[in-house]
Amino acid sequence: MNKIEEILKKINITIPNPPKPVGNYAAFSRYEKLIFISGQLPITTDGKIITGKVMKEVSLEQAQKAAEISILNALGQLKIACNSDLNKVKSCIRISGYVNCLDNFSDHAKVINGASDLIAKIFSVNLHSRIAIGCNSLPLNACVEIESIFEIN
């Protein structure tokens, strides 16, 4: 078992098989030592999407969990990009988080903490940079979408 798998087991997290892209694009791309993960939606292991506007149909806590599910799907894509060897991953460089919300919503950062907190537990060496943006809508009416960049050895 590699170091990342040991950490995941310790915090009781399983990386899912990631969902297929919902459009005509690659789930990830690689440039030198960087892996760019396309936007990941909160699609659960049973194929359901957590949908709706945050603080209207989705609570803050549900949105945070959706962000965690989205970053787990990103980790699933990363695992494929690394031929199942997550020890190749040096760090998470950046997370871009998009929140489907009403105009007066301002807790975007709290929502995306659902993803950042998990990444910090796994890759505790370096914190990643991040942006949290509010949107009027997202693909498939998802409540959250997470895009990420990782560095590999």
Description of each model-found segment:
Residues 1-153:
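Short, polar/acidic, helix-capping and beta-turn segments at strand->helix junctions
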